Amino acid sequence: MFLAAAPYFQTRFQDNESILAHFQSAIISVGTITNLGSMLILGAMQSKASYPKRIISALVLNIIVFILLSISTSYFRDVSSGGYLGFTLIMVFSTSIATGLCQNGAFAFASSFGRPEYIQAIMTGQAVAGVLPSVAQIISVLAVPPPDNWASAETLAAVEGKDNTRSAFVYFLTATGISILTLFATFPLVRKHSRILESRMQMLTSVEEAEQAKRKVVGMWTLYKKLHWLAASVFICFAVTMFFPVFTQKIVSVVPQDKAPRLLQPGTFIPIGFLAWNLGDLFGRLSTLLPFSMRTCPIVLFIFSILRGGFLPLYLLCNIENNGAVIKSDTFYLFVVQGGFGATNGWLGSSCMMGAGDFVQESEREAAGGFMAINLVAGLTAGSLLSFAAAGIS
């Protein structure tokens, strides 16, 4: 969510070079560390968990955060870069807690049915959630009238800053609306879930008791012994993936800015880079629906997760911070690098998450879903910390 709004944050932090260079890695690190911590805590709270309540709480928290972000684009503009970075990181912290609640609730809830396609649906939904912010950011930028090409450089910079601010306002407001719609869409699912549990266990006094009675508390070590290859694969997969946002917000079109159409200006090209990656990710996750599947071959998935690191050097061939590209092609960057890196992430991540239920007992599936989600977030956290090494590349 925060990554696709990079042009807006670059405008807010432009008077502090240190923050401008490292805000992306700071956002990623705070987000993933908080997410991992919340997932570990929630994973240890299996016996009394109400997963539908966790999902609803996450959506309410997201709505509050996105409203505050929308307000911040128009008010408190005189806040220093350091002050606004602090506010942004608090918002990241809050959304990461919400993400932990939602991921834990959704994966555990879906895993309890023992149907891999339910996990695949969640993974695909996450990919769609990655595509929509990029699309919203691009549309919001293009919706603003283009600047006067005859204006001075100072005027153009000021106009670009205002455009990024308006785009960010529309962007965060759209996220608020989507979160509200999702919250209302969740209520029928919760009611259906309650009816299923009540019909299964009419002897118990409440739906929450029915949920808890059928739940088996499983230790992390027990799950690791059964799922170590898949857990390692999903960890490495997402650790490698976390380098892409750092490079994406640095890479601009090979077409000179004074000759580039508006679609290739940094304000739109950076979101297009995120969109290309997320579309590849969506395609990769959907490809797991094909009859050919590798989720029953965890060692092969582990080897593939290591080989996937070969995508990272390809970013060095692109136009980082407009310093020139080795391969002077936006097509190469968007389709081969971003699209390919995203597609392999979607396919590998989904295959690992879907395969977990095949290697545990039925009573352990719910815990296995939460366990795999923890490894996924742990990979994101490790990758975000390692991505600081790439922050200084230009």
Indicate where each model-derived feature is located.
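Membrane-interfacial loop- and helix-cap regions that link adjacent transmembrane helices
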Residues: 7, 16, 64, 72-91, ...
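Central cavity-lining transmembrane alpha-helices of secondary-active solute carriers
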Residues: 26-47, 64, 131-134, 271, ...
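A late C-terminal transmembrane helix in Major Facilitator Superfamily
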Residues: 330, 334-343, 352, 357-392
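Eukaryotic endomembrane system proteins
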Residues: 100, 115-233, 237-242
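Small-residue-rich segments within alpha-helical transmembrane domains of MFS-like 12-TM solute carriers
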Residues: 96-104, 241, 342-350
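Eukaryotic helix-linker segments that join adjacent hydrophobic helices
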Residues: 26-97
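Loop-to-transmembrane helix entry/capping segments in MFS-fold secondary transporters
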Residues: 18-22, 104, 111-129, 267, ...
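A gly/Pro-rich, aromatic-decorated transmembrane alpha-helix motif that marks the paired
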Residues: 40, 127, 131-146, 378-393
